[in-house]
């Protein structure tokens, strides 16, 4: 495990001079997601223990922690992907702009339109680049070619991919490099204009250059969406996030602005993890 140098977040850096939010006292207008006393079980095994936190709008929030700590489970709870797991049950609430996503009347398909997700490995469909991007729009019933064309271009531009593929939109997406495929998947996710974008270790299968491109993209995406990212890479969390949550064995140990968590953590477990004493 590599420790984080405080110099990376020293005063004068972009991350250090950004205005900090009081995460314990956000106004309703500042909150995208409000998680309240969330518990999740796989059968009798408890994977999340009474998680309570608020995730701000228009910022990047990172979940970090050792393997098996619950960070990906928490991420998947935000768009109810855990519903697909046998014998999984949940108590507590996750409120998206004030509405509990676990209310029995919630349309889960509509929820997943509002809360998009990108996984560890790029998963383009065996279709053209264009059809990958507009896939969700077609599912929603959009068939107007002009609107589809506009959405495809806008989404590919937002994903920093347009200039690389604009002359081969009707070629197979499977011919793209790994980094390009991951940006294509991000373009597909944002084409339907979600409110929140979930990224589950989006660069773990990519080379360093592609990783840097995705990290720069994340910084741009928060201008349009609320972004929540799971990462094993603490340097990445320090680079891309505005606030960071450290999890351990299903518990939320510490949650604060990223600069504070990596330079002056309040909890001994957090300090031990970020300095490489375990994990």
Swiss-Prot record:
Enzyme class of the recorded protein, top EC level: translocase
GO CC entries: plasma membrane
One GO term of the biological process aspect: phosphate ion transmembrane transport
Positions annotated to bind ATP: 65-72
InterPro entries: AAA+_ATPase, ABC_transporter-like_ATP-bd, ABC_transporter-like_CS, P-loop_NTPase, PstB-like
SUPFAM superfamilies: P-loop containing nucleoside triphosphate hydrolases
Gene3D superfamilies: P-loop containing nucleotide triphosphate hydrolases
EC number: 7.3.2.1
Record note on quaternary structure: The complex is composed of two ATP-binding proteins (PstB), two transmembrane proteins (PstC and PstA) and a solute-binding protein (PstS).
The protein, known as: Phosphate import ATP-binding protein PstB
Species per Swiss-Prot/TrEMBL record: Colwellia psychrerythraea (strain 34H / ATCC BAA-681)
Gene name of the record: pstB
